[in-house]
Regions:
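C-terminal-biased regions
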Residues: 1-12, 17-117
Length: 117
């Protein structure tokens, strides 16, 4: 798997953890919710540590801020038993995940264009 695929796999895992956390919340499974949020937080930290600030500059900084916000929001949601926090993070991450899913198509187009020039 290349680096884009690895990042996509992290996003898939993150979305699964967030969905699991919501399910645990709805079933009043406090231990399960706590574990799922813990896993989601670790994945967010992993995504944040994979950012390339030299290459990505402003985009990397913005993603870092977003991941940091999501970690704080999940911790608050866990402490306050707030499903809306989990849903908010899930919605934010879904948008970023969607952009990563389009990246291979964009990269392939760039490669084809540069090969033609």
């Amino acid at each position: 798997a290349d680096s884009v695929q690895l990042i996509q796999m992290l996003f898939d895992g993150l979305m699964t953890c967030l969905a699991d956390a919501e399910g645990h919340f709805e079933r009043n499974d406090i231990k399960g919710k706590h574990e799922s949020i813990g896993k989601a937080t670790k994945i967010l930290v992993g995504l944040q540590s994979a950012l390339d600030f030299e290459e990505g500059k402003e985009l990397a900084a913005n993603l870092s801020d977003l991941y940091d916000y999501c970690v704080r929001r999940l911790l608050k949601a866990n402490i306050r038993n707030d499903i809306d926090g989990i849903k908010e993070v899930r919605s934010l991450i879904q948008e970023v995940k969607g952009a990563w899913e389009m990246l291979p198509q964009i990269l392939n187009k760039d490669v084809k264009v540069s090969m033609v020039s």
